[in-house]
Amino acid sequence: MRLLTRVLLVSLLTLSLVVSGLACGPGRGYGRRRHPKKLTPLAYKQFIPNVAEKTLGASGRYEGKITRNSERFKELTPNYNPDIIFKDEENTGADRLMTQRCKDKLNSLAISVMNHWPGVKLRVTEGWDEDGHHFEESLHYEGRAVDITTSDRDKSKYGTLSRLAVEAGFDWVYYESKAHIHCSVKAENSVAAKSGGCFPGSALVSLQDGGQKAVKDLNPGDKVLAADSAGNLVFSDFIMFTDRDSTTRRVFYVIETQEPVEKITLTAAHLLFVLDNSTEDLHTMTAAYASSVRAGQKVMVVDDSGQLKSVIVQRIYTEEQRGSFAPVTAHGTIVVDRILASCYAVIEDQGLAHLAFAPARLYYYVSSFLFPQNSSSRSNATLQQEGVHWYSRLLYQMGTWLLDSNMLHPLGMSVNSS
């Protein structure tokens, strides 16, 4: 019986994934096979994402120069990919040294270049710099940046080369000069390198019994305060963590409201429900990335009478905290520290994200019905291990295949995190 149930659940899961994938089809093209998307070349001096290189939304802050004698030199790894030409004008092999993340993105780009221009290879003119030839705090000093061209040095290709670099996953790409393209990545251990959508473990949720519980202590089956699609407060089943990490330090956005003064702390890619300052209609609220919320907008706060109330955002700042948790409820929403938030992240579409988690909700309800457990045994038996949940990891990977890269937050989860 148990085997049959598992087979049935896997079948339903697979079917739901296929349907969710097809639903991403544009308009009347629903269910049709997508044609390869057209690559739009970057313009001269354009950079993607459209923020400064060493900010949270791009490659993150400078962490210090690496020399051959420093402890961090072991973070660099040589790249001997035969499909990449290294200029290496210093004749020291320095241009081949880079972080593993930079190496992975560069190797991916090399394949794209050969596929796009048969007979042409990727060329690296500058990698790790140990001679001080760049400006202060350049990411070249950490092996996190490369300057690239094509092997034929055809400048008419550089705009498209920039776009290919974006598609390959570099965290910041800059059509810097007529002579080369500049690309960089996040640090391997950077708090910016892995974000996804999370709350700190100390954030509080409200329970149906009137008490409160820290997010990190939630167990499947706990009924927590959330909101339905009409904006009504409800108590919803906590189903799972899409990510559960007790140790990693991450950067969180802190969004603080005016009267009443409340704060919610969440990662950049997490969705928060907002209203424009010009309206009080809760039905017009939309889900926006925490990193895109601005002072003057409104968020939904649970007031003393237990009702949702729109309150103006007073200020926004960032802080580092250790530990991050991403809870999912049956309704796809959750009230954290008295402010209504989504359970989802990375893609700025609450409806699509909630649809994508339909198989997870189905599995929870079916397993709860077939294998009822008391709260203590459920706490011990079903609480997941640390790391990104396999289903969340799968959805993110599918999203990178099916959706345009600009539909995903630049600080989307690391599919290699554990």
Curated annotation (Swiss-Prot):
<dbReference type="GO" id="GO:0140853">
    <property type="term" value="F:cholesterol-protein transferase activity"/>
</dbReference>
<dbReference type="GO" id="GO:0000139">
    <property type="term" value="C:Golgi membrane"/>
</dbReference>
<dbReference type="GO" id="GO:0070444">
    <property type="term" value="P:oligodendrocyte progenitor proliferation"/>
</dbReference>
<dbReference type="Pfam" id="PF01079">
    <property type="entry name" value="Hint"/>
</dbReference>
<dbReference type="GO" id="GO:0030947">
    <property type="term" value="P:regulation of vascular endothelial growth factor receptor signaling pathway"/>
</dbReference>
<dbReference type="GO" id="GO:0042476">
    <property type="term" value="P:odontogenesis"/>
</dbReference>
<dbReference type="GO" id="GO:0042694">
    <property type="term" value="P:muscle cell fate specification"/>
</dbReference>
<dbReference type="GO" id="GO:0005615">
    <property type="term" value="C:extracellular space"/>
</dbReference>
<dbReference type="GO" id="GO:0021984">
    <property type="term" value="P:adenohypophysis development"/>
</dbReference>
<dbReference type="InterPro" id="IPR050387">
    <property type="entry name" value="Hedgehog_Signaling"/>
</dbReference>
<feature type="lipid moiety-binding region" description="N-palmitoyl cysteine">
    <location>
        <position position="24"/>
    </location>
</feature>
<dbReference type="GO" id="GO:0008015">
    <property type="term" value="P:blood circulation"/>
</dbReference>
<dbReference type="GO" id="GO:0007517">
    <property type="term" value="P:muscle organ development"/>
</dbReference>
<dbReference type="GO" id="GO:0007368">
    <property type="term" value="P:determination of left/right symmetry"/>
</dbReference>
<dbReference type="GO" id="GO:0001839">
    <property type="term" value="P:neural plate morphogenesis"/>
</dbReference>
<protein>
    <recommendedName>
        <fullName>Sonic hedgehog protein</fullName>
        <ecNumber>3.1.-.-</ecNumber>
    </recommendedName>
</protein>
<keyword id="KW-0645">Protease</keyword>
<dbReference type="GO" id="GO:0048663">
    <property type="term" value="P:neuron fate commitment"/>
</dbReference>
<dbReference type="GO" id="GO:0010001">
    <property type="term" value="P:glial cell differentiation"/>
</dbReference>
<dbReference type="GO" id="GO:0048839">
    <property type="term" value="P:inner ear development"/>
</dbReference>
<dbReference type="GO" id="GO:0010002">
    <property type="term" value="P:cardioblast differentiation"/>
</dbReference>
<dbReference type="GO" id="GO:0005509">
    <property type="term" value="F:calcium ion binding"/>
</dbReference>
<keyword id="KW-0256">Endoplasmic reticulum</keyword>
<dbReference type="GO" id="GO:0021986">
    <property type="term" value="P:habenula development"/>
</dbReference>
<feature type="short sequence motif" description="Cardin-Weintraub">
    <location>
        <begin position="32"/>
        <end position="38"/>
    </location>
</feature>
<dbReference type="InterPro" id="IPR036844">
    <property type="entry name" value="Hint_dom_sf"/>
</dbReference>
<dbReference type="InterPro" id="IPR000320">
    <property type="entry name" value="Hedgehog_signalling_dom"/>
</dbReference>
<comment type="similarity">
    <text>Belongs to the hedgehog family.</text>
</comment>
<keyword id="KW-0378">Hydrolase</keyword>
<keyword id="KW-0564">Palmitate</keyword>
<dbReference type="GO" id="GO:0030510">
    <property type="term" value="P:regulation of BMP signaling pathway"/>
</dbReference>
<dbReference type="GO" id="GO:0005783">
    <property type="term" value="C:endoplasmic reticulum"/>
</dbReference>
<feature type="site" description="Cleavage; by autolysis">
    <location>
        <begin position="197"/>
        <end position="198"/>
    </location>
</feature>
<dbReference type="GO" id="GO:0097264">
    <property type="term" value="P:self proteolysis"/>
</dbReference>
<feature type="lipid moiety-binding region" description="Cholesterol glycine ester">
    <location>
        <position position="197"/>
    </location>
</feature>
<dbReference type="InterPro" id="IPR009045">
    <property type="entry name" value="Hedgehog_sig/DD-Pept_Zn-bd_sf"/>
</dbReference>
<dbReference type="GO" id="GO:0030902">
    <property type="term" value="P:hindbrain development"/>
</dbReference>
<dbReference type="GO" id="GO:0048703">
    <property type="term" value="P:embryonic viscerocranium morphogenesis"/>
</dbReference>
<dbReference type="GO" id="GO:0005794">
    <property type="term" value="C:Golgi apparatus"/>
</dbReference>
<dbReference type="GO" id="GO:0048618">
    <property type="term" value="P:post-embryonic foregut morphogenesis"/>
</dbReference>
<feature type="binding site">
    <location>
        <position position="95"/>
    </location>
    <ligand>
        <name>Ca(2+) 1</name>
    </ligand>
</feature>
<dbReference type="GO" id="GO:0009952">
    <property type="term" value="P:anterior/posterior pattern specification"/>
</dbReference>
